[in-house]
From Swiss-Prot:
Phylogenetic placement of the source organism: Eukaryota, Metazoa, Chordata, Craniata, Vertebrata
Modified residues (N-acetylalanine): 2
Ranges of Low complexity composition bias in the record: 333-344
N6-acetyllysine PTM positions: 67
Chain's gene name: GTF2E1
Role according to the record: Recruits TFIIH to the initiation complex and stimulates the RNA polymerase II C-terminal domain kinase and DNA-dependent ATPase activities of TFIIH. Both TFIIH and TFIIE are required for promoter clearance by RNA polymerase.
Residues noted as binding Zn(2+) in the record, renumbered to the chain: 129, 132, 154, 157
Gene3D superfamilies reported in the protein's UniProt record: 6.10.140.1250, Zinc/RING finger domain, C3HC4 (zinc finger)
Name of the protein described by the UniProt record: General transcription factor IIE subunit 1
Keyword presence, Metal-binding: yes
Keywords recorded for this protein, A-Z: Acetylation, Metal-binding, Nucleus, Phosphoprotein, Transcription, Transcription regulation, Zinc, Zinc-finger
Family: Belongs to the TFIIE alpha subunit family.
The keyword Zinc-finger appears for this protein: yes
Domain HTH TFE/IIEalpha-type residue range list: 14-104
Length: 439
């Protein structure tokens, strides 16, 4: 059961006391801030900014001044918003018990200071020597009096002293104390009236409350914003959440493609249109390098040359098939070379017989097709051998199993499976291939 002497509402005398004190000894900004706290038990700092329209720095200076003088108290609370973000807010309120004690202390301190000034003014020096600047009080008048001349003379230089007007109090201290008591009498009356007031704990330490005026303005602003968003259409939905989003701040998408680089290069070239061939590919820029007859006889096939160049630009996917075909072609060329070697003496004999003929018959006779065919086969065989030497891929051992050098280069996991001896052989083979390439 609650104590009947405990008040659950702040008496009007306490509110008037706070208003009198704040208006009598502080500025208008302090009075406005305290008026809000008198009307509302506990107010958030942001709400006070909204009501007073002060700058945040100015408002905090005013509140810190009042808090330093123990007129108000501050309480910090951590609040969680709807989006899960936590913020700290300062709530200010008046502890009326502390306010009464502070007012009593400050008034008593002022009264004591006035009494001290009164006591000091009665004991100040009232006589001063114009020569040696010695000062004397009223209690030393018997020492200064000279009965022969009937004057007050200095005890050091025997010069007649003068009354020290600068040491005289400008105002009577007893008058100041009387005026102080007269002006502070309304505050004294309120203090006597609130002497035995006992306030409940929820009044001394109030909980935060919402200001009705601010609530109405916020509801009206929310309604207006909702209507504006509906009228604006769907393009305003992107601005619905103004808070920053950090979901994708530390997310990195890495795509690892295990396909061959040749496929990627070919895919990138598919969407591009074929460019016109430059003049040095379409025809020779060297005068007399190739004759028209050689072009017609098939000595140089420009279309085949173009296809070969395009084939070099994009590597062949069927490398294994081409390797098998080249090996088969080599075997065929070797068999044909054996048959040509058997017919070579006959050709040589025919050539020696033809030497006895005249030069005129040599010019008129057509070229022998057998010799041309043999010469062409030899050239083709040499070209095939050179191409095969270039096309042959060295064999590398990986954990005792044979693999081609190109396959190991494209699959780094095979290198990890090598023994130290196999890895040294693999590195040495790569160095030799690199040296052969630039020799």
């Amino acid at each position: 059961m609650a104590d009947p002497d405990v008040l659950t509402e702040v008496p009007a005398a306490l509110k008037r006391l706070a208003k009198y004190v704040i208006r009598g000894f502080y500025g208008i900004e302090h009075a406005l801030a305290l008026d809000i706290l008198i009307r509302n038990p506990c107010v958030k700092e942001e709400d006070m900014l909204e009501l007073l329209k002060f700058d945040r720095k100015q408002l905090r200076s005013v509140l810190n001044n009042l808090k330093g003088d123990k007129f108000i108290k501050c309480r910090m609370r951590v609040e969680t918003a709807a989006d899960g973000k936590t913020t700290r807010h300062n709530y200010y309120f008046i502890n009326y018990r502390t306010l009464v004690n502070v007012v009593k202390y400050k008034l008593d301190h002022m009264r004591r200071r006035i009494e001290t000034d009164e006591r000091d003014s009665t004991n100040r020096a009232s006589f001063k020597c114009p020569v040696c600047s010695s000062t004397f009080t009223d209690l030393e008048a018997n020492q200064l009096f000279d009965p022969m001349t009937g004057t007050f003379r200095c005890t050091f230089c025997h010069t007649e002293v003068e009354e020290d007007e600068s040491a005289m109090p400008k105002k009577d201290a007893r008058t100041l104390l009387a005026r102080f008591n007269e002006q502070i009498e309304p505050i004294y009356a309120l203090l006597r009236e609130t002497e035995d007031v006992n306030l409940a704990y929820e009044i001394l330490e109030p909980e935060p409350t919402e200001i009705p005026a601010l609530k109405q303005s916020k509801d009206h602003a929310a309604t207006t914003a909702g209507a504006a968003s509906l009228a604006g259409g769907h393009h305003r939905e992107a601005w619905a959440t103004k808070g920053p989003s950090y979901e994708d701040l530390y997310t990195q998408n890495v795509v690892i493609n295990m396909d061959d680089h040749e496929d990627l290069h070919r895919a990138s070239l598919e969407g591009k249109s074929a460019k016109e061939r430059p003049i040095w590919l379409r025809e020779s820029t060297v005068q007399g390098a190739y004759s028209s007859e050689d072009m017609k006889e098939g000595g140089i096939d420009m279309d085949a040359f173009q296809e070969h160049e395009e084939g070099r630009a994009g590597p062949d996917d069927n490398e294994e098939v081409m390797r098998a075909l080249l090996i088969h072609e080599k075997k065929t060329s070797s068999a044909m070379a054996g048959s040509v070697g058997a017919a070579a003496p006959v050709t040589t004999a025919n050539g020696s017989d033809s030497e006895s003929e005249t030069s005129e018959s040599d010019d008129d006779s057509p070229p022998r097709p057998a010799a041309v065919a043999v010469h062409k086969r030899e050239e083709d065989e040499e070209e095939d051998d050179e191409f095969e030497e270039v096309a042959d891929d060295p064999i590398v051992m990986v954990a005792g199993r044979p693999f081609s050098y190109s396959e190991v280069s494209q699959r780094p996991e095979l290198v990890a499976q090598m023994t130290p001896e196999e890895k040294e052989a693999y590195i040495a083979m790569g160095q030799r291939m690199f040296e052969d390439l630039f020799e």
